[in-house]
Amino acid sequence: MGKDTIADIITSIRNADMNRKGTVRIGSTNITESIVKILLREGFIENVRKHRESNQYFLILTLRHRRNKKESYKTILNLKRISRPGLRIYSNSQRIPRILGGIGIVILSTSQGIMTDREARLKRIGGEILCYIW
């Protein structure tokens, strides 16, 4: 039984967003750094810092919160893990799903690295569907 780092960061971000926390601290690996770069580029998180504590690196994410006039707080970040260690889900470039008609993003692991669904369609490559974000 291995550790699923992608599910861990998705759960950490989702829990912090639901509890109105401003920051999240997650372990730094190559995969988590790639996913966090995509989240930052797409505007789902506000800031990222790399922090070192006794030979271990951590990423400190600053979450983006939007306030609604009717409610004091509204969760805008929804994440769902798709492919998992027990059941891998693959897709070619034509069958990559669109989330909310293109508003959300799909993060894929391809032969050219971790990228969004739009980038994979432009490059016409498929891969393993890691998660949905909307």
From Swiss-Prot:
This is Small ribosomal subunit protein uS8c. One of the primary rRNA binding proteins, it binds directly to 16S rRNA central domain where it helps coordinate assembly of the platform of the 30S subunit. GO terms for biological process: translation. Belongs to the universal ribosomal protein uS8 family. HAMAP family: Ribosomal_uS8_B (MF_01302_B). GO terms for cellular component: chloroplast; ribonucleoprotein complex; ribosome. It comes from Olimarabidopsis pumila (Dwarf rocket). One of its GO terms (molecular function) is rRNA binding.
